[in-house]
Amino acid sequence: MEKLKIYVNGKEYKNIFTRVIWSGAIYGTARKLEVEYLGDIITNIGDEIIFSYEDEKLFYGKVFQHSRKGETELKSFYAYDNSIYLNKNNFVKNFFKKKPSEILKEICGELNLKVGKIPQDEVTCTYPAIDRSGYEIILNAYTIQHRKNKKIYSIVSNEQAIDIVEQGTYTDVLLTSADNISTSSYEESIENMINQIVIYKVEKEKQQILYKVENAEDKKKFGLFQQVMEYEKDVDNIANAKDMLKSVEKSARIYCLGNILIQAGYSIGIQEPHTGLIGSFLVKSDTHIFEGETYFCNIELAFENVMDKVQFENKEKAKKNKKKRAKKAKKKDKIDELFPEGWDKKKWAN
C-alpha cells in the first residue's frame, strides 16, 4: 500500500494499513472511510482525517468510531465526511420566499459547514420544515428548483465544503469484460412499481379528482400500482406526476479493478456483453477496497437518473382551511346573537 496515505490531525501514516474501504452512494449518504491497521493506536474520536491515493486527496472527514481486538494487534476506525452533519441534525424552520442558496447557507451556517460550488438560483421557496434533517430541508429546496428546470441535483461534500452538483456528469472511465471487469450481475423487479398517479384537489372541504397519469403498458402487463398527489398551483402537476411513475426496476453490480474516478453520482461507460450491460450508466454506489497490494471496486449501477425527493406536508393549505372554518363559525355565532333564546330563526327569515 505504498500509494496510500492517511493523515490524522495533519500527521502522515503509511505502510501500516491492512485494509482500507472508501465508499459512498447517491441519495444523501455521506462518504465513509473504514481503516484497519497494525501497531500503536493512531486515532481518537473526533480526529480530523485525510485519505490520499497516489498523492491525490480523496477524503476529508472525522473519526466517528475506533476499536481494537485484544487477541491481536489489529486496530480499526471509521470516519465520515462533513455531509454526515446534514443527516445527523434536525431543525424547526419556516421558510418564506427564500432562494435555495439562502436555505443552504442558513442550514450550513448553523452547522459551521462551508458552502462550496452551487448552481444559480431559479426559484423561491416557501415551506415549513418541522423536525426535518438538514439534508431533507436542503434537498426540498433544490427539488422545487428541479421541478422548474428538470436538472438532477445531489448534495455532496468536497474538500470539507458542501456542494450542490448536477448528478450524472460523465467521467472518463470505460469498464470492459476483457480488461478490468472481474464479475457482473443484473436483475429486474416490480417491487416498487407505480403505474398510475391520481391528482386530486380539495375545494370547499370536498375532494375532487382532476387527472390520472398512467403507464398504460405497465398497468396492462403487471396490474394496478397506484399513488395519489395533491394538485399544486403554479407548477406542472402532470409533469411531476410523470416523475413519480416507476416502471420495472433494473439493477446491476460490477466488481472491477480499482479506479478513483468511479464515484456515486457520476456516469461511466460499460461494455459487458454477458449481462447485456453496454452503454453509459450512473453509479448508484461505490465501494473501493484496498487490501495488501490489491485495489478493487464494487459498484452498483442505476438505470435511471432521477432526483432524490422528500415529501413535505403543505401546512399552508391546512392553515387556510382552519381559518376559513373559524371565520364561518364566528359568523354563525354573530347571527345567533341577534335572536333571543327559543326563537325559530328559519321561520323568522320566511
Which stretches of residues belong to each language-model region?
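Extracytoplasmic
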Residues: F17, A30-K32, L58, T72-L74, ...
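Short solvent-exposed strand/turn elements
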Residues: D40, L74-N90, E293-E313
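Assembly/oligomerization scaffold segments
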Residues: M1-N89, A178-T183
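Charged- and aromatic-enriched interaction segments used to assemble
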Residues: E73-Y186, K345-N350
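Short, acidic/charged, Gly/Pro-enriched secondary-structure junctions
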Residues: M1-V8, Y37-R68, K98-E110, L257-S280, ...
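Short, basic/aromatic beta-hairpin or loop at an interaction surface
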Residues: T18-K32, D234-K250
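Short, conserved beta-turn/loop elements at beta-strand boundaries and strand-helix junctions
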Residues: H66-E71, S285-E293
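Acidic, small/polar-enriched beta strand-loop surface segments
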Residues: L139, I152-M244, S251-E291, F303-K309, ...
